[in-house]
């Protein structure tokens, strides 16, 4: 995997929902962005904030050498990003991570795409690429409330889409686990499952598909270096009774088969 660093230029930025921002960047690094589910590590342009921030890639446009990121303002670093304007530059390291494996599904087959909250953005590029292969995509997307929901129309344009909110203000009342359970009860069995979101959601998916060979989970561990050097983002492997075997989410992931890791 190629890993490069570049000062990329901000092309546009806008707010999608409370604390949710869409950031478009332009630069040569985009040439190396190919697999959905990869991320970049962004240096905060402030001297007292040393650690880079990992943000997943939402869309890739090779023809214009642009990529789109969607992030949520969580602290001082992302607060700085939210104030930046078109024409300014950011120090970007990437692309990082292994990305989703889309080779296991073929045209005419069905993929469930499951996302929650800020885990939703990388699934858009995934859905686009699966569509291009002729795979039928069915989206299951969960939000805290209607107020913080975003990208509904974009996903609906790519395929069948089901929504859920914690408070019932939009879509089904509850989480995406409920939506998946209802789909399975109707006999809808996917050829592959792709998911990104909070650990609780991923655990629910793991329990719903305990023996499925093609369930891919994007883990949201905290990352410091982004290149596998600091061991801050490790998780343990299934089948390891010693507890000594682990994988580095930033370098060997962030996507793993559900059968590989302990959530």
Swiss-Prot record:
Biological pathway: Pyrimidine metabolism; UMP biosynthesis via de novo pathway; orotate from (S)-dihydroorotate (NAD(+) route): step 1/1
Residue stretches making up the FAD-binding FR-type domain: 3-102
Any one Gene Ontology molecular-function term assigned to this protein's record: flavin adenine dinucleotide binding
Pfam families: DHODB_Fe-S_bind, FAD_binding_6
SUPFAM superfamilies attached to this UniProt entry: Ferredoxin reductase-like, C-terminal NADP-linked domain (SSF52343), Riboflavin synthase domain-like (SSF63380)
Function: Responsible for channeling the electrons from the oxidation of dihydroorotate from the FMN redox center in the PyrD type B subunit to the ultimate electron acceptor NAD(+).
Family named by the database record: Belongs to the PyrK family.
PANTHER family: DIHYDROOROTATE DEHYDROGENASE B (NAD(+)), ELECTRON TRANSFER SUBUNIT, DIHYDROOROTATE DEHYDROGENASE B (NAD(+)), ELECTRON TRANSFER SUBUNIT-RELATED
Protein name: Dihydroorotate dehydrogenase B (NAD(+)), electron transfer subunit
Gene that produces this protein: pyrK
């Amino acid at each position: 995997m190629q890993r490069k660093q570049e000062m990329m230029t901000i092309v546009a930025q806008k707010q999608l929902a409370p604390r949710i921002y869409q950031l478009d960047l332009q630069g040569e690094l985009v040439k190396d962005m190919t697999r959905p589910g990869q991320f970049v590590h962004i240096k905060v342009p402030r001297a007292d904030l040393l650690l880079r921030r990992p943000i997943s890639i939402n869309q890739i446009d090779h023809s214009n050498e642009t990529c789109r990121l969607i992030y949520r303002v969580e602290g001082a670093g992302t607060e700085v990003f939210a104030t930046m304007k078109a024409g300014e530059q950011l120090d970007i390291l990437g692309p990082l991570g292994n990305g989703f494996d889309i080779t296991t599904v073929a045209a005419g087959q069905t993929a469930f795409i499951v996302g929650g909250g800020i885990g939703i953005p990388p699934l858009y590029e995934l859905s686009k690429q699966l569509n291009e292969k002729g795979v039928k995509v069915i989206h299951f997307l969960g939000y805290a409330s209607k107020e913080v929901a975003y990208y509904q129309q974009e996903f609906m344009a790519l395929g069948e889409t089901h929504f859920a909110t914690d408070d019932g203000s939009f879509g089904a009342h509850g989480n995406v686990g409920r939506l998946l359970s209802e789909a399975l009860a109707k006999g809808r069995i996917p050829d592959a499952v792709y998911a990104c979101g909070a650990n609780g959601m991923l655990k629910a998916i793991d329990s719903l598909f305990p023996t499925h060979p093609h369930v891919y989970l994007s883990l949201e561990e905290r990352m410091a270096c982004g290149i596998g050097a600091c061991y801050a983002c490790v998780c343990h492997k299934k089948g390891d009774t010693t507890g000594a075997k682990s994988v580095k989410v930033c370098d060997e992931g962030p996507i793993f088969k559900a059968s590989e890791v302990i959530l």
